[in-house]
């Protein structure tokens, strides 16, 4: 029996157990291949401070699919290309403690392995760094016996990008479009949580989808931190003791852990029964166990949070507004917390009404900016949504279910160590601290929605009064104008004056294919109004005296002061389309506004 045992490589293991990495069925396999390549592209661009411009194409080749993913990132040096794409468990972030999309060095090489298993075709990688004149091309397989790359072709070629990486894979699978679990939906949700990225996707039938960049602001890259004493396990501690360069146990504590200074080190040593002069490399399992027990008895400051990279409230709200065109949107980023020594934070966005027509709430789940498309029912983020009493916030809900409303709920969990339920990283485990933080964030956006709905109800009552005035006033105005032989009056403006509103009017004229847009703001309230006026547009915008931000989608912003009975006029030129139905205003209550909508996000 013993003669039958032999060592197998990690590549051989995943060759026989590819379902562990997300390749459990043909449709899911194509999504996973695209996901791994796009995640790599986003990480590379962000680390280099480059606004991501990612191109994805899927085409049918005989009875399988060719997948091409191309980015404008920093590129990969030639000597690193074979190991990055042809060796499992080869990566740059495995030993770092910081937020990142991938960490183990398995993702993209597993996609290469899946391609060669299902079609027998090698991966083609083209990459160029900024200091190179020509791109490097490498065609390779993975030797599963050795877990090493096998290069079958390499060379140089001209490439149109100054830097970047392109990977081509041919895989077996099924391409689907009209469902939640699809490549299209994955890329759409990726664009929502990465508003700084532009993603172009060409489908097998030639359909071109462009997910535009909403902001030019690149997220601040997270920093690496040392382990926190409350997040360490016995085996890891033993390994750290053996490999440290520290010559004494006291120096080991201070140099190898975060939040351990002289005073804390003394406290830990006293509780563990050590002097601090011990040699770390000579300490055994029992010594490590004493040290670990002392860690658990000691209060440490939470780990620093600059190892996390949140999306931010404004960016989440702006992204939801651009993608779904709701009537209400609000986002919240909770302060970082810790579970088992691992920093994490929760962000939640809620979009309601407007162009959202679905009866059931759409839930978008993310972990470290990656969409979670599968296992929604078994995910802690879903459980947190179901545990909130949404009836209190104006939605319909059956107990223990997602609420029913024309709404989108976005949840983003960022952490140095996402507690996934499996290796395929499809759902989050039920960690009490994470569920509690998610509930608090959901309740906060719920309260904001309730306030909005109550204001909307008051406004509807006021509108009824307006309608009554609106029915009578035109008849009176018409008769008066006929008698006095005057031009017809602006009824909306007169109603706004009677009701005491801040009235906004948008006038659009077409001149030689260019929209000339004039916005007139009239203050019929009793107080001065300091407001911000917004228009969201796609196309080329020229606006004197306004701030224009973004590319692809542009936000035009005016800061205005309007005194009682004063009228202010602004204008801009647009070669494109206006996204928002009515002008958006910040700085005035909704029940005092007519002709525009209140900007409902922080």
Curated annotation (Swiss-Prot):
The lineage of its organism: Archaea, Methanobacteriati, Methanobacteriota, Archaeoglobi, Archaeoglobales. This is Type 2 DNA topoisomerase 6 subunit B. It holds the Pfam family HATPase_c. Relaxes both positive and negative superturns and exhibits a strong decatenase activity. Keywords: ATP-binding, DNA-binding, Isomerase, Nucleotide-binding, Topoisomerase. Belongs to the TOP6B family. One of its GO terms (biological process) is DNA topological change. ATP binds at residues 40, 71, 92-93, 102-109, 425.
């Amino acid at each position: 029996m013993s003669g039958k045992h032999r060592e197998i490589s990690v590549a051989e293991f995943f060759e026989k157990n590819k379902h562990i990495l997300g390749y459990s069925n043909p449709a899911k396999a194509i999504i996973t291949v695209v996901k791994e390549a796009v995640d790599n592209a986003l990480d590379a661009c962000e680390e280099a401070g480059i606004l991501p411009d990612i191109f994805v194409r899927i085409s049918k080749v005989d009875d399988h699919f060719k997948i091409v993913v191309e980015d404008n990132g920093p590129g990969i040096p030639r000597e690193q290309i074979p190991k990055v794409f042809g060796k499992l468990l080869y990566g740059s972030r495995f030993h770092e403690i910081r937020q990142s999309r991938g960490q183990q060095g398995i993702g993209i090489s597993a996609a290469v392995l899946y391609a060669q298993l299902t079609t027998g075709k090698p991966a083609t990688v083209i990459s160029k760094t900024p200091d190179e004149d020509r791109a490097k091309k490498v065609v390779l397989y993975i030797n599963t016996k050795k877990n090493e790359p096998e290069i079958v072709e390499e060379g140089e070629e001209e490439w149109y990008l100054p830097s970047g990486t392109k990977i081509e894979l041919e895989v077996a699978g099924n391409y689907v479009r009209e469902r939640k679990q699809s490549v299209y939906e994955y890329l759409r949700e990726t664009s929502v949580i990465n508003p700084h990225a532009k993603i172009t996707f060409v489908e097998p039938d030639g359909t071109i989808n462009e997910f535009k960049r909403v902001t030019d602001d690149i997220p601040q890259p997270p920093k690496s931190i040392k382990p926190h004493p409350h997040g360490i396990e016995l085996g890891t501690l033993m390994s750290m003791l053996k490999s440290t360069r520290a010559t004494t146990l006291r120096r080991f504590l201070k140099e190898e852990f975060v939040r351990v200074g002289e005073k804390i080190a003394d406290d830990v040593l006293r509780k563990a029964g050590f002097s601090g002069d011990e040699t770390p490399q000579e300490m055994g399992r029992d010594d490590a166990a004493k040290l670990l027990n002392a860690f658990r008895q000691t209060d440490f400051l939470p780990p620093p949070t600059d190892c996390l990279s949140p999306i931010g409230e404004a960016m989440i709200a702006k992204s939801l507004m651009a993608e779904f065109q709701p009537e209400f949107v609000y986002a919240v980023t909770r302060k970082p917390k810790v579970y088992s020594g691992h920093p994490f934070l929760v962000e939640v966005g809620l979009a309601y009404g407007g162009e959202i027509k679905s009866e059931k709430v759409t839930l978008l789940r993310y972990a470290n900016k990656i969409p979670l498309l599968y296992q929604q029912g078994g995910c802690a983020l879903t459980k947190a949504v179901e545990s909130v009493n949404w009836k209190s916030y104006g939605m319909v809900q059956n107990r223990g279910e997602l609420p029913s409303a024309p709404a989108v709920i976005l949840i983003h969990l960022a952490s140095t160590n996402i507690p996934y339920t499996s290796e395929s990283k499809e759902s989050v485990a039920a960690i009490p601290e994470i569920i509690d933080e998610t509930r608090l964030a959901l309740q906060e956006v719920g309260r904001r929605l309730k306030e909005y709905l109550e204001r909307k109800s008051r406004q509807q009552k006021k509108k009824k009064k307006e309608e009554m005035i609106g029915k009578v006033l035109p008849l009176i105005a018409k008769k008066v104008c006929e008698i006095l032989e005057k031009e017809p009056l602006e009824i909306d403006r007169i109603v706004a004056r009677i009701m005491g509103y801040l009235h906004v009017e948008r006038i659009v004229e077409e001149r030689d294919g260019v929209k000339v847009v004039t916005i007139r703001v009239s203050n019929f309230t009793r107080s001065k109004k300091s407001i911000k006026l917004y228009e969201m547009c796609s196309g080329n915008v020229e606006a004197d005296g306004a701030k224009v931000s973004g590319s692809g989608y542009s936000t035009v912003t005016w800061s205005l002061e309007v005194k009682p009975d004063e009228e202010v006029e602004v204008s801009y030129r647009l070669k494109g389309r206006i996204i928002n139905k009515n002008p958006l205003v910040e700085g005035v209550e909704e029940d005092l506004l007519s002709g525009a909508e209140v900007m409902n996000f922080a």
